[in-house]
A protein has these predicted regions:
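Histidine-rich, glycine-flanked metal-binding segment
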Residues: 1-6, 12-61
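Divalent-metal coordination cores built from histidine and acidic residues
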Residues: 89-172
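Metal-associated gating/positioning segment near the N- to mid-region
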Residues: 55-114
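His/Asp/Glu-enriched, well-ordered alpha-helical/loop segment
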Residues: 238, 242-251, 270-281, 287-366, ...
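Active-site core of metal-dependent hydrolases
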Residues: 167-290
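Residue-level marker for buried hydrophobic side chains located in beta-strands
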Residues: 6, 63-65, 200, 279-280
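C-terminal cap of metal-dependent C-N hydrolases
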Residues: 10, 352, 362-394
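Conserved, mostly hydrophobic/aromatic
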Residues: 68, 136, 192, 222, ...
Length: 394
């Protein structure tokens, strides 16, 4: 049972557009009961125990969904500890995230299994952002494009290994990053599709033709577009070219202005269907960390002046971002992306792509995971399942 609430005097960004000067009623089931224009508010009759909260002319949006991150606040999936995952949940709620997919690095198989089991154990115990399931980045990826993943964990395609990872996840693995060019990938892709696991092309040296072959067996999404993948060349489109050319290919994007230049983000939005673009952070354990040494997947890290983490021993190697979804939202809006499009990328699209029923859009009957922002895009409140878990109205 949730507390009944009414949010008034806001622009409601539904996930398919925006409605100015509107309000949202959250019912006792933790669902969106109604969306109404403020001209009708005086004629509305709500139960007497309903709390009325004034958005003050700000924005009422779906809670943001981060479908790819490794850590935040000094806690990460590499800790192999349910406590760390639950701490991530708390810290993500502080920055407007209502749901997330903790992402497991490529590592030794035993380490990956421990990480997966820790996330599964944490599920259902959250006091902040809900854990939707597990994102596994590897291990069937290209050594040439390994990036910050542990090269010792990179493996050839092996269905027995895949099954060990799936079994460790107890049905909670939602998606996995793979290199489509690897031998045996067709069989693995069909096997994954039977189990409802979304495969993303990433950490890949695939040719344009390899990506087309992957699409034929259901590899229709891609990991942190432009990063850790074969480049666009006028004689070989590579993975980057394939994702740009093929309208059905979906892609993640890290909107920190460092991993991808803002003008390329704008180009992507111009040339690709908005439905197929997902905002992520790829944030690391030391994101928003206060004090202590900075490490990510065991690699000593340094926070560069541009806000991205680089390997301490190799400042040319990006190992992930220090981004939050809320800052990513502000960034793309600064790059002249309308807020309704930004919210679609941060909430609606990941919910649809990963089959998250009744999430990612503000429509009656959907789960009341709601983010309230002021006019300057600062967080005022976060509701999860209709419960006000972060209150900054005062």
């Amino acid at each position: 049972m949730s507390q009944r609430s009414v949010l008034i005097n806001g622009t409601v960004v539904t996930g398919y557009g925006k409605l100015k000067d509107c309000g949202v009623y959250i019912n006792e089931k933790g669902q969106i009961g109604d969306i109404f224009n403020m001209s009708r508010f005086s004629n509305k009759h709500f139960p007497p125990d309903t709390t009325i909260l004034d958005a003050g002319g700000g924005y009422i949006t779906p809670g943001m969904i981060d479908s790819h991150l490794h850590g935040i606040g000094g806690f990460g999936t590499e800790d192999n500890d349910p406590h760390s995952i639950l701490q991530m949940s708390e810290r993500l709620a502080d920055v407007g995230v209502s749901a997330f997919m903790p992402t497991v690095y490529t590592n030794t198989l035993d380490e990956m299994i421990r990480s997966i089991k820790a996330i599964s154990e944490a599920m259902g115990k959250e006091r902040g952002a809900r854990i939707l399931g597990i994102n596994v980045e590897g291990p069937f990826i290209s050594l040439k494009r390994v990036g910050a993943q542990n090269p010792e964990g990179v493996l050839p395609v092996d269905l027995a290994v895949f099954n060990r990872l799936i079994d460790a996840g107890e049905g909670n693995i939602i998606c996995m990053t793979v290199a489509p060019e690897l031998k045996g990938m067709r069989e693995l892709a069909l096997f994954a599709r039977e189990r409802g696991i979304v495969l993303l092309a990433g950490h890949t040296d695939a040719s344009y033709e390899n990506i087309l072959e992957g699409m034929q067996v259901g590899i229709l999404h891609s990991t942190h577009f432009f990063n850790a993948m074969s480049r666009l060349h006028h004689r070989d489109p590579g993975t980057v070219g394939a994702i740009l050319i093929e309208k059905d290919m979906q892609c993640e994007i890290i909107p920190d202005g460092v991993h991808v230049h803002p003008q390329l983000v704008k180009m992507l939005l111009r040339d690709k269907p908005l439905d197929n673009i997902v905002m992520i952070t790829d944030s690391l354990k030391p994101t928003r960390q206060r004090g202590g040494s900075l490490t990510a997947n065991g690699v000593p890290a340094t926070l560069g002046p541009n806000g991205a983490f680089v390997a301490k021993d190799d400042p040319t190697l990006f190992i992930g971002s220090g981004l939050t979804m809320l800052q990513g939202l502000r960034n793309v809006i600064d790059w002249e992306v309308p807020i309704e499009h930004a919210i679609q990328m941060s909430s609606t699209n990941p919910a649809r792509i990963y089959g998250l029923s009744k999430m990612g859009m503000l429509i009656p009957g959907n789960i009341a995971d709601i983010l309230v922002l002021d006019k300057n895009l600062q967080m005022k409140a976060l509701f999860i399942d209709g419960n006000l878990i972060r209150d900054r109205f005062s």
